[in-house]
Amino acid sequence: MAEAKNRVCLVVIDGWGISNETKGNAILNAKTPVMDELCVMNSHPIQAHGLHVGLPEGLMGNSEVGHLNIGAGRVVYQDIVRINLAVKNKTLVENKHLKEAAERAIKGNGRMHLCGLVSDGGVHSHIDHLFALITALKQLKVPKLYIQFFGDGRDTSPTSGVGFLQQLIDFVNKEQYGEISTIVGRYYAMDRDKRWERIRVCYDALIGGVGEKTTIDKAIDVIKGRYAKDETDEFLKPIILSDEGRTKDGDTLIFFDYRADRMREITECMGMERYKDLNSNIKHPKNMQVIGMTQYKAEFTFPALFPPESHKNVLAEWLSVNGLTQFHCAETEKYAHVTFFFNGGVEKQFANEERCLVVSPKVATYDLEPPMSSAAVADKVIEQLHMKKHPFVMCNFAPPDMVGHTGVYEAAVKAVEATDIAIGRIYEACKKNDYILMVTADHGNAEKMMAPDGSKHTAHTCNLVPFTCSSMKYKFMDKLPDREMALCDVAPTVLKVMGVPLPSEMTGQPLVNEA
């Protein structure tokens, strides 16, 4: 077994952000002598929100993403951010799976379809992604492109569809490429409740041209006529704009929604055998290829433009590879975070990894029991520290986040104080058993319990979080040369303190210099 230069105990506090605002700040106003000492002694604030953790810019962090980044030692970009960056940097044209789809179309019958929700709602799809795909496919020289327009009206206003259709018409005219072939509401195209009779309406339209026939120059007037009869974007019955734009034998179809749940049924019918459940009279085309924007379901046989990324050699795996044992502990509410998410989004327990689940209190809301099971989690961790069995011990403390979500300020103060007491007990055990204690948080919460208007604030925040190290041999540097410090730097810092070399997959940086 490899030897660790130092043993490390990593504590991840849930929902502990840094803010100088005193009003409604359950962290600043609580008695936290232990965290105060650790922060003054040797610490640095780090970023835990937005692009720093792979989320869209300005979006508050969350527990899942926080633990994923902490454990991975790299920024783990969410699907939407990966797509947005490809669109912004104009690199879609280099996407391996898009190039393969284009080659298939070119070598085959020359026909490609883009199918999806056309709006700027940003929940399931974005019109900018559609524009970028049209541009990329034109650059890749796909001869014929057909666009199947799914009306929104749910994540956007109910009659905004004509505006999005006009934008698409203008874009296609400007590019002199692509043809809008079908318009149908998401009610029929994007069902997720196995209401196959709805999906059949869309299926019959896309393949068989079943619907009201008109031309592109009259399409907006047709939709406005539907609005007058209270048939809004979501519920638009199929409008067929060209016979050529039906899906035919040998066609290639890209569905450009990035959210999976409402794409599963329609793609399973178009790209797999599920169409048999529709009892449609329309003959299913042969040799069609479906591609998703993302992986809609692990069991689906067709490719995705942005498949899930595998996170090889996350901290837990790397310690295991190096023959080092480890211990992960949390109460029920956060157990998945110290196992599945901390381990890179995999359920698998690595070799020499021990886990411990402490049951969360059975109460209606956690403001009724602010300390939650923090004392019991500390007990389990201290037990391990005394055994000196594992060179890496980690745990999560849930109270600041879970009680923070209740919006009850006084309870949040108690939750913060209970967490500080628990960390204090662990700190004493670390000193006695020669462990270096490192403390961080996955995102902010309890430091903002009050909104500007005085009402309860129950959400996460975009504030910085602490990162502390109890050994003065490893002093935090002032800054990184090219970016702000963030959660992705926690695992590399832990490895540096343990004296374990970093895997090449970790792009985070150690934030301490050895004295």
Swiss-Prot record:
GO MF assignments: manganese ion binding; phosphoglycerate mutase activity
Keyword Signal attributed: no
Temperature dependence: Optimum temperature is 32 degrees Celsius. Active between 17 and 32 degrees Celsius.
GO cellular component, one term: cytoplasm
Alphabetized Pfam families for the sequence: iPGM_N, Metalloenzyme
GO biological process: glucose catabolic process; glycolytic process
Binding site for Mn(2+) 2: 14, 63, 442-443
Free-text remark on how the cofactor is bound: Binds 2 manganese or magnesium ions per subunit. Cobalt and nickel are less efficient.
Reaction catalyzed: (2R)-2-phosphoglycerate = (2R)-3-phosphoglycerate
Record EC number: 5.4.2.12
Binding residues annotated for Mn(2+) 1, in chain numbering: 401, 405, 460
Protein's pathway: Carbohydrate degradation; glycolysis; pyruvate from D-glyceraldehyde 3-phosphate: step 3/5
InterPro entries from the UniProt entry: Alkaline_phosphatase_core_sf, BPG-indep_PGM_N, Metalloenzyme, PGAM_B_sf, Pgm_bpd_ind
Superkingdom per UniProt: Eukaryota
Record keywords: Glycolysis, Isomerase, Magnesium, Manganese, Metal-binding
Active site: 63
pH dependence: Optimum pH is 7.5-8.5.
Cofactors that this protein relies on: Mg(2+); Mn(2+)
Regulation of this protein's activity per its record: Activity is not affected by 2,3-bisphosphoglycerate.
UniProt-annotated binding residues for substrate: 124, 154-155, 186, 192, 259-262, 334
Function summary: Catalyzes the interconversion of 2-phosphoglycerate and 3-phosphoglycerate.
Family: Belongs to the BPG-independent phosphoglycerate mutase family.
Protein name, per record: 2,3-bisphosphoglycerate-independent phosphoglycerate mutase
Organism from which the protein derives: Brugia malayi (Filarial nematode worm)
Gene designation per UniProt: ipgm-1
